[in-house]
């Protein structure tokens, strides 16, 4: 009964909470559109503002829980063409990106991908990003649409500094923004079987974190194995002229068109961060539980922007840590305060929270004071002026289903 009430709350409140997350007040006439806008409308999508774009929240009468479960059990496809796709090329491209991020890109194998973070001078996260290395002088990078202006201004500023430096003079780096390119995420346990019917490329060799140019029904497309759901899947980059055709190929039964609502519940079950909720410029990768993106060889000696602040948190411990929790009672949403149960001391706040369709429990992530982050710790979360019990639990909340061969 508790979960049924929570599911009802989810359906009623989720769309508005999603919009509040991004604090969008953009008028519809000002919203950008991906190359699939008309395709979405033709398929009954409910379009909503998100990160400056008009994006599908859901399709037809497919409910949030049903859409979520379809991806967990079968396969769904998401339009993520609002995200910013870029190429960095040049003799010193590896050095430039290792200056902007704490990742060890020099040791990354060609056509391998890694999650990373762009850091400000204090070690705060400007954005999280996926970086795919094609060669030492060529990288494909995906960043968040909601951070487009901030990211591109930062990248161009730092690119100018780099190319004007002694290192940059060894070989300037060029930035190419892939404007209007499509990006589709095919996700779910049946994703590989479905995509395999469209290509002669043996997808068994394309394991999680790898990328390749794959022939798909006559189109040679950049395909990276991974995603934002915790399931097996692929992110497929598509030139503007072919986006609609490829979307049609990737949306036949059993694939279900899937929107932002489902994408958010899937990523939270998988323990993945949403920028603007769980990450911001006042949060370091150590606080965010993303220490693993910092290359082992770079923790002590890496010369990256923000290194001093990051090393301070690595050495002394951060003031707070990102945690997952199971919440009793009503679901806890963003900004819900977290308290110590006995003293009543304020420990932190929830950054994302939903009723989990998979677990049939209310889950949340947030930040608490360092020392209160251990598994099994009991805390209280304030929901509508009432304090409810919550127990800290490891993330991801569900077991990932990535294909590792």
Outline where the language-model segments fall.
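Conserved, structured C-terminal
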Residues: 2-10, 20-49, 55-59, 135-137, ...
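Acidic, proline/glycine-enriched N-terminal capping motif
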Residues: 2-4, 15-119, 124
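Acidic active-site catalytic centers that drive phospho-/nucleotidyl reactions
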Residues: 79, 128, 235
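Well-ordered mid-protein domain cores that form the structural environment of catalytic cofactors
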Residues: 103-158
């Amino acid at each position: 009964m508790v979960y049924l009430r929570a599911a009802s709350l989810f359906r009623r409140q989720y769309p508005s909470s999603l919009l509040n997350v991004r604090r969008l007040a953009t008028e519809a006439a000002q919203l950008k559109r991906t190359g699939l806008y008309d395709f979405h409308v033709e398929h009954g999508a409910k379009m909503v503002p998100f990160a400056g774009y008009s994006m599908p929240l859901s399709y037809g009468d497919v409910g949030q829980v049903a859409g979520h479960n379809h991806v967990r059990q079968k396969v769904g496809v998401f339009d993520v063409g609002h995200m910013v796709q870029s190429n960095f090329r040049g003799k010193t491209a590896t050095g430039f990106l290792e200056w902007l991020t704490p990742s060890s890109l020099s040791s990354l194998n060609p056509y391998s991908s890694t999650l990373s973070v762009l850091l400000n001078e204090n070690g705060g996260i400007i954005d999280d990003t996926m970086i795919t290395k094609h060669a030492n002088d060529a990288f494909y990078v995906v960043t968040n649409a909601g951070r487009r202006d901030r990211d591109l201004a930062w990248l161009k500023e730092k690119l100018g500094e780099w190319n004007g430096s002694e290192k940059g003079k060894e070989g300037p780096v060029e930035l190419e923004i892939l404007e209007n390119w499509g990006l589709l995420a095919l996700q779910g346990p049946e994703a590989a079987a479905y995509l395999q019917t469209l290509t002669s490329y043996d997808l068994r060799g394309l394991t999680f974190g790898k990328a390749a140019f794959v022939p798909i029904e006559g189109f040679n497309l950049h395909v990276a194995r991974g995603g934002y759901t915790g399931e097996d899947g692929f992110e497929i980059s598509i030139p503007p002229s072919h986006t609609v055709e490829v979307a049609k190929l990737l949306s036949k039964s059993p694939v279900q068109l899937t929107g932002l609502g489902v994408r958010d519940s899937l990523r939270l079950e998988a323990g993945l961060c949403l920028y603007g909720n769980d990450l911001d410029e006042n949060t370091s990768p150590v606080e965010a539980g993303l220490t693993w993106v910092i290359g082992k060889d770079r923790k002590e000696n890496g010369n990256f922007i923000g290194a001093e602040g990051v090393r301070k948190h690595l050495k002394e411990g951060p003031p707070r840590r990102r945690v997952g929790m199971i919440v009793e009672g009503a679901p806890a949403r963003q900004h819900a305060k977290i308290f110590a149960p006995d003293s009543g001391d304020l420990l932190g706040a929830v950054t994302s929270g939903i009723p989990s369709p998979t677990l049939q429990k209310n889950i949340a992530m947030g930040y608490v004071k360092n020392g209160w982050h251990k598994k099994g710790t009991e805390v209280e979360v304030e929901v509508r002026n009432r304090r409810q019990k919550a127990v800290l639990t490891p993330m991801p909340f569900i077991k990932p289903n990535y294909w590792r061969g």
